[in-house]
């Protein structure tokens, strides 16, 4: 994950209860509003509410890689509020109007940086639970790409989140994902070759999400592209399959024609049905 990811995929419409208004959501955010995270960091946010009196189910939106801001979640905000969801979106720490320092993620610093990003996402959940407009018992986490590492950590830190929805999110260690991405951009073209080369990798692994996924009791749904050249989809599914055998409520949908960017129309209905089970 070497670049910021576009958010055209973000037309996700999760219908899991609450009012289903036809009109756009309304902002509930004072100018310059922030909420606190760890280490004195304050995160600039927007909280978008559907029409109606609430309390509303809510989603905390997690970032992909890069210097992303709350404005890059506008599409998901519009879709979610139309279906009765509140959406909390915020500038990544060290980006936009949020304080703190921005860092990219690598094998050496990954555990620390991803932990900080998870602290921020969990702080968003805690913030929502202080708001009278929000049903604190119906909060879910959603994200793309890098959020595949962040969301399981955030779910550990935020008890009672109802579900996780991850689009193109890896379950492999950071070092392995970076190595795969480098190979895919280089001379290794076939997925059999890529998988074989991954098995030979002897470099630093860095942060590994698997132990955290093993310890969670939060249902999760992954949408994955078979042609993804950013994350190793085969290995991600292998890990999810193994975790399912130990009783974890993890499932996935593999889209054969697509890579890292899966058109929203391909998965929105399934995502909505999944979230509808957590009223």
Question: What is the predicted function of each stretch?
Answer:
Residues 23-52:
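N-terminal cap/lid segment of alpha/beta-hydrolase-fold proteins
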Residues 66-77, 92, 234:
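The serine-hydrolase catalytic nucleophile loop
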Residues 80-101:
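Conserved alpha/beta-hydrolase
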Residues 109-132:
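Alpha/beta-hydrolase active-site loop
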Residues 153, 157-196:
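Hydrolase active-site cap/lid region
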Residues 216, 222-224, 228:
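Short beta-strand/loop motif that positions the catalytic acidic residue
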Residues 218, 232-242:
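Short alpha-helix in the alpha/beta-hydrolase fold that links the catalytic acid
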Residues 256-279:
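Catalytic active-site module of serine/aspartate enzymes centered on a nucleophile-bearing elbow/loop
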């Amino acid at each position: 994950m070497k670049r910021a990811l576009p958010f055209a995929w973000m037309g996700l419409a999760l219908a899991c209860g609450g009012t289903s208004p036809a009109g756009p959501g309304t902002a509930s955010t004072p100018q310059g509003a922030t909420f606190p995270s760890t280490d004195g960091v304050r995160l600039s946010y927007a909280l978008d509410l559907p029409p109606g009196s609430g309390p509303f189910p809510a989603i905390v939106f997690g970032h992909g890689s890069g210097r992303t801001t709350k404005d890059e979640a506008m599409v998901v905000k519009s879709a979610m509020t139309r279906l009765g969801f509140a959406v909390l979106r915020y500038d990544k720490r060290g980006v936009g109007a949020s304080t703190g320092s921005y860092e990219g993620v690598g094998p050496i610093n990954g555990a620390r940086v991803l932990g900080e990003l998870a602290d921020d996402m969990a702080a968003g959940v805690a913030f929502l639970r202080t708001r009278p407009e929000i049903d604190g018992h119906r909060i879910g986490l959603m994200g793309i790409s890098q959020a595949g590492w962040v969301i399981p950590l955030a779910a550990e830190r935020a008890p009672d989140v109802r579900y996780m929805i991850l689009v193109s999110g890896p379950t492999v260690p950071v070092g392995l994902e970076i190595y795969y991405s480098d190979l895919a951009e280089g001379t290794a073209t076939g997925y059999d070759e890529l998988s074989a080369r991954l098995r030979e990798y002897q470099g630093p692994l860095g942060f590994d999400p698997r132990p955290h996924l093993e310890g969670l009791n939060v249902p999760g749904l992954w949408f994955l592209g078979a042609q993804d050249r950013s994350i190793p989809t085969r290995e991600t599914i292998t890990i999810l399959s193994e975790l399912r055998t130990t009783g974890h409520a993890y499932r996935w949908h593999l889209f054969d024609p697509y890579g890292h960017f899966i058109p929203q129309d391909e998965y929105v209905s399934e995502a909505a049905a999944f979230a509808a089970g957590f009223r």
